[in-house]
Amino acid sequence: MIRLSPGFAINPRFRSDSFVNSQKPPFLSVQIGSQRRNLSRIGSENGDGVAFDAVAYEADRLSLDAAAMEDMAETAKKELESDPDSDPKAWKWVIRKKMWDLMEARNYAMSPRPVHHRIPNFVGASAAARKLAELDAFRMAMVVKVNPDSPQKQIRFLTLSGEKKLLTPQPRLRTGFFSVLESDLLKPETIMEACTSVGVAKYGRAIGLDEKIKVDLIVIGSVAVNPQTGARLGKGEGFAELEYGMLRYMGAIDDSTPVVTTVHDCQLVDDIPLEKLAIHDVPVDIICTPTRVIFTNTPIPKPQGIYWDKLSPEKLRQIRILRELKNRLEKKTGRKLPTGPSEKLPPTAERKRR
C-alpha cells in the first residue's frame, strides 16, 4: 500500500539560509582520549585543559573507515566466491553488489563515491528526507534515532531543526555507544555542523547502557529494501541490527517503535527471500523515496535483543560496548553467554567444494 503524507513546516529558527556567511561559533568542549593530548588545539578546552581537535578526529575517522571498508571488500569478495548453497550470507552480497553497481552505472549515486561498501548516498536524498519529515510518526516524535550515514544527513538536520532530540550512534560503535544532541543546547549556526560526524563528537552527549530514554522513531539506511515485505539489506557490517538490539536491551524501544528507511527508487527490490533472513535482521515499517512513501505492513518479526550466538568473536573484539554488555549480563546471570561463529571464511577451494 502506498500513501503520501501531508506537508511539513520547518521551524524558521533553523532555516538553511541561517548558515550562509555565519561566523564559526566557539567549539563546545568534549572529553577526548589521552592519545590526542598532544594534538593542536582549536576552540575551548574541557575540564582537563584538553581541546577537541576536529581535524585530527576527522582524519582518524576517515582512516579507520577506509580500513573497515577494505576489510568489508575482502569479505564481500570471499562471500561472492563461496558456494551459495552452503554459505547463508552469500545471497545478500549478490544483491548488494548489483545495487552498488547499478547506482554507479546510472549515476544515481552521490558523494562519497564509489558507493560500494557504504550505505549509498543518492540523488534525491533530501527529497526523501522531506517525505519522511511529513510522516505523523516523525511529527509526533520527541526522540529520533538516525544512522550517521551521508544520505540521512538531512534527516538529522530536520530532527534538530524541528526541536527534537537526536540520537545517533558513534561511527561503527568504535569509541562508544550513542550520542544525544538537543536543539535547545545548540545555536542555529551550529545545527548543520552537528549533523556531521565531527559535529556529533563536538556537541553530542555520550550515553551509556543505563541511560533512561524512550526513542519514538528509528531511521536506518539501506542498500536494498523490499516494499512488499519491509525486508532490508544494509552494507553488511550489522551495525543497524546491533544498535537495535542494544536499544531493546535498554528498554528504549519495543515492537511498536516505527522503523523507517530512505532510499532511491532504484533501491526497491523484490528478490530478498524472507525464508533466508536471519533472526536479527531488522525490517522496516515505512520506506521514503524521493517520489513516494510506502507503508510495508511488514510481516517480519523485529529482533528482541542481541543474539549472542550469532555474534562473531571478531565483532565482539571490535566493539567495546558489546563486551561491556556481555560481561554485565554474564555477571548478572552467573552463566557464560554463547558466541557465534568466526567471520573468517575457509579458503576459496574449500568453500566451493561440494
UniProtKB/Swiss-Prot annotation:
Summary of the knockout phenotype: Embryonic lethality when homozygous.
The organelle targeting sequence, given as a residue range: 1-51
Cellular-component GO terms for this entry: chloroplast; mitochondrion
InterPro entries: FTHF_cligase (IPR002698), FTHF_cligase-like_sf (IPR024185), NagB/RpiA_transferase-like (IPR037171)
Pfam families per record: 5-FTHF_cyc-lig
Compartments where found: Plastid, Chloroplast
Region (Disordered): 330-354
GO molecular function: ATP binding
List of residues binding ATP: 60-73, 234-243, 281
Residues involved in substrate binding: E134, K235, G236, E237, G238, F239
Keywords: ATP-binding, Chloroplast, Nucleotide-binding, Plastid, Transit peptide
Function noted in UniProt: May be involved in thiamine metabolism. Does not possess 5-formyltetrahydrofolate cyclo-ligase activity in vitro.
Family membership noted in the UniProt record: Belongs to the 5-formyltetrahydrofolate cyclo-ligase family.
Identification of the protein by name: 5-formyltetrahydrofolate cyclo-ligase-like protein COG0212
Source organism per UniProt: Arabidopsis thaliana (Mouse-ear cress)
